[in-house]
C-alpha cells in the first residue's frame, strides 16, 4: 500500500528526530485515553482504519521513526467516552520520552511530502511470528506494546513483530467492520482489540483498547463490500 505522509526533522539539542504524520488527517477516526478511563476505544471508518493499519505497519519496520497520528481534532462521534488523545507509535530505539513530546510537537512545521510503501505480506508474516511465540510461550511474548499517556497523547512503544500484529488487528476492523449489522445501520460496531498486545498488567482494572468501526454520514455514500463503488444511479429522463 502506498501512503502519503509528511516528514519532519525537528531537533532537540544535539538530537535530530524523524517524525511522520499522515498527509491528510484521519477526520473520522477517534481515540480516547485508555489509561485515565481504563478503557480506550479506537473508532474509525474504513478509510481511517485502513490508513491507520498502514501506519502501524510502517512503524513496525521504521525503528528510528516516530509516527504521529493527530486524532484529538477529529470529528466527534456519538459514542466516544473519555478524553480524546492523539496517537504516537515508536520503537524504544527512537529515543522518544513522553515528557519531551510537547516541546518536540511544537517544532513540527514545514513538513515535506513523502510517499511510503507498506508490504502487507511481510507485515502478516511478522504478525504470525508474534502470535506463534505467544502460543509457544503460553501467552507470554517477548514484545509488547507499552502504553503511556502524556499531554493528551497516547504513546505505544513496541517492536517490529508486535506492531505488525497490531496492524493486522486494525486492518481486520477496517475490512470486516462494514459487514457488521450495527455498522450497516449507522452505529458503531466493536470488531477487534489491541488489548492482547498490551504489556501484561495483572491488576483487575488493567487498561484495554478496543477497535470499532463506524461509517461516517451521509450513509448513502457508503458502499458495502461486494458492491461496485462506481455504481451510478440511473439518469433522469430528459424532458
Residue ranges and their predicted role:
Residues 1-239:
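Positively charged, low-complexity terminal tracts
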